[in-house]
Amino acid sequence: MNFSQLLAAVRGGEASVIVPASWAQGRASFGGLMAALLFEAMRQKVVDGRPARSLAITFVGPAAPEVPITFEVEVLRDGKAVSTLLGRALQNGEVVTLMQGSFGAGRESVV
């Protein structure tokens, strides 16, 4: 699978995604790819297409290639202007990547 196909699988709500070995270095899938996939899962839960304003990513453990990865997204708060979400990428029931994000609507400003 190429990058677009992996994102499309997450966007399409696949139960799990398998990252091919070509997207790995050693025993772990590339961190940037894991961040992108988890971000895409989180974006699906954001109201009104609010853009990301901040992200904090923790690579908890290596995401092994060729092993199914599932994504869980929890909406911590949906406020009037900002949504705060927590995303988890899991393999074999263990968290491999954790992401907290704030997605906020723009504000009018004269600055």
Question: Where would I find each of the regions flagged by the language model?
Answer:
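Terminal targeting signals and extreme-terminal segments of soluble enzymes
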Residues: 1-111
